[in-house]
């Protein structure tokens, strides 16, 4: 069951449950599919009827009447979505924001129904314009809002670039390393950290545009950005982090630090954990992680680049891709893009030396991680750890 309020917003946001337009709560028994499947009185120019084609509504599973606002839906879900957008409505879930939406329960919670409409790809802008473009956005449509002096996006369409970033992932999606929240031992922490480092190099090797760069540029970019990529991977993989095993892995129990240095070190540990936690609270999805990692990877500040301007243009492509993706997928979270982008400077503030000491001291000893990354990248193999502690 959901309450309706004036002022359309993203289903992920909270509302106060008051109808600002002065209307009453919608009746839970009202069925939005009252109009017959063949009705055309409210047809939009962007709707595509499919007579004779048996396709289910992707929102509720009822029989669809065609393609509406980008996806196949029934007349009921089409009308509900159009009404929600045109009347600028938003809803509040009275349960846990995970209500079942099917043919029999679709009218019980408007919040979760609208949330599912967006999740399956229904387009808010298609309602506002009365039609939906069939082609992918071209270069002119891919510039970030208000951008000046930014090179237009001339690479693959935004959706294709993100698809390439997702395909570059060497492991399944978030939570891939499990852990279930249990406190891991030192060896487990180090093993998971090694796998995260492997995945960082493997992802970069298959990321769009990166393989075409000169080998020296590839090494320079990874040597500079590996710690940021590691933190992003740790957050994406939901790596279970607990202070005690981290400190043990860093060798602090065997060789205690001076008090002043230990306090500073603990502050850095907390800063690292805080960055991972903040990414978790933002509920960053896989596509956003891919874009953030690409923005971090293509840093024109890396030393010795043969063409820093080209690397900067690649970074801009990833940033534009993130802009367009967030705008399309989270249309009523206008601050989301800024919040995501602000994570990157904070990640860079986490010292690479801290990550090395926390996670890799037992595995590589005094061997610099940057040397290890260079060797893995140039050898073409990340799953053969060539170093021992010493």
Curated annotation (Swiss-Prot):
One GO cellular component, as annotated: nucleus
What changes when the gene is disrupted? Answer: Reduction of neurons in the locus coerulus of the developing cortex. Defects in circadian behavior. Hyperreactive lymphocytes, late-onset immunopathology and hypersusceptibility to Th17-dependent experimental autoimmune encephalomyelitis.
From the UniProt annotation, which stretches of this protein bind DNA? Answer: 54-129
Give the NR LBD domain ranges: 157-380
Q: Which UniProt keywords apply?
A: DNA-binding, Metal-binding, Nucleus, Phosphoprotein, Receptor, Repressor, Transcription, Transcription regulation, Zinc, Zinc-finger
Region of interest called Important for dimerization, as start-end residue ranges on this chain: 314-390
Query: Compositional bias (Gly residues) at which positions?
Result: 1-15
Q: Which residues carry this modification: Phosphoserine?
A: 35, 41, 84
SMART domains annotated for this entry?
HOLI (SM00430), ZnF_C4 (SM00399)
Question: What's one GO MF term for it?
Answer: zinc ion binding
Subunit info here reads: Binds DNA as dimer; homodimer and heterodimer with NR2F2 and probably NR2F1. Interacts with THRB.
The protein's name in its UniProt record: Nuclear receptor subfamily 2 group F member 6
Native species of this protein? Mus musculus
UniProt lineage:
Eukaryota, Metazoa, Chordata, Craniata, Vertebrata
